[in-house]
């Protein structure tokens, strides 16, 4: 009886390696697609909200936030909607870099930490300007309106520049060493880092094109371009081979146990 039960159990047991490979393939598609959706939402939100520049006058800031209140809030909402998609992509990127880097995973950890820190800095900088727009900029003291706009600009440009550079440089090094993705992504990453350095230098400027690290908005645009290229190349590349599970031998072991 036990022998017959063991034989049936061994026959019914699914090939876990096959199901694991299918799950990995689905995850390989979902991660990059989520990244592209997140970047699309963030870009659309930025273009819709059109937050005032650092060199704008206080009157211009109040006028834009008050007159285009619904448009600004819609854009800000899209920027926050992007976060769950980008976090999903980050979980995929962590797995990709951890497999490519090997046992140490120092750069994979740095990538995850810098991306999360970048999200926190940008989101925190948008909270105050969101509150001002929601309340109505015309009823908020002008000094507070300007303070909120300046915080959003600083968080988006100069203050987030160091972690933005780390979020690109760390995965670029792994990609260059492992060739997990095309190496030209690393070269593109160096251009992004150069833009981040210019953003950080703008922290010491209160006037001109690079005030508060604005630099005509080139820094965030380059980061989005690099992240989009990363998502597209990851989606186009085949999923990395999953390790064969040791549980595939469980069927024969159960069969032998039943016979004995």
Model-identified regions with their sequence ranges:
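Hydrophobic, aromatic-enriched alpha-helical segments typical of multi-pass transmembrane helices
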Residues: 2-260
